[in-house]
Amino acid sequence: MPQVTMRQMLEAGVHFGHQTRYWNPKMAPYIFGARGKIHIINLEKTVPLFNDAMNFISSVAQKRGTVLFLGTKRSARETIKEEAERCGMPFMNQRWLGGTLTNFRTVKQSVARLKELEAGETDGTFEKLVKHEVLGLRRERDKLEASLGGIKDMNRLPDAIFVIDIGHEDIAIKEAKKLGIPVIAVVDTNYNPELVDYAIPGNDDAIRAVQLYSRAAADAVLEGKAAAPHAATVREEEFADAPAEDAKPARRAPAKKAAADKGEAQA
């Protein structure tokens, strides 16, 4: 399991929450106190939950499952892409398209179109077209690449989702919960940790903190892959409608009754 110390979390600013006026009472057990109207997260509570989350990610990868890395806010985009690519997992870092999970068959059609356009660029098809047609096709390709490029090799629904900011990615989390896909997420002091299966109490804005979470998640994936049995894998169905059963968490999260506080805040 990736080793991240409390000192590393302190140096990355993981302990800085949002302004006290925006807090969610469900986060009370994880808050140490306040400093200058900013909540301070208790890292003694964060560390074990962080370790649980990383262990789960590793277990999914060990079973040859897929973990979708998700972070579309500006501070997370670059890191999410880099770390997902490093560990060979799909990602979305620009904009979540509604229905990406719940309407996955349609999304796959868009992915197929993206691959068709990419092939046309390399096999000489574009050379047979007039200039304005080529420009139009390239614009279409670039648009699809920006929104779907990170998941174009994801042939079935993911077995888990790793999320940086649950408020920013609330639609994705609702889709995942509807389909029973486990969610591992960083939860700041202004949101409800009960909305996800594996909550990591921590700063979801600071770039260094985002890098720490994402790097650890990628390391957990690589560790799980390294421990995976080398037996031949069973062929995956092209359009699976649900995640693998054995990748679901062993324990159930408490009932999700409270809605997340949608107040905007600056850490």
UniProtKB/Swiss-Prot annotation:
InterPro entries: Ribosomal_uS2, Ribosomal_uS2_bac/mit/plastid, Ribosomal_uS2_CS, Ribosomal_uS2_flav_dom_sf. Residues 232-267 are annotated as: Disordered. It comes from the Bacteria. PROSITE patterns: RIBOSOMAL_S2_1, RIBOSOMAL_S2_2. One of its GO terms (cellular component) is cytosolic small ribosomal subunit. GO terms for biological process: translation. SUPFAM superfamilies: Ribosomal protein S2. Residues 258-267 have a biased composition (Basic and acidic residues). Keywords: Ribonucleoprotein, Ribosomal protein. GO terms for molecular function: structural constituent of ribosome. Signal peptide: none annotated. Belongs to the universal ribosomal protein uS2 family. This is Small ribosomal subunit protein uS2. It comes from Stenotrophomonas maltophilia (strain R551-3).
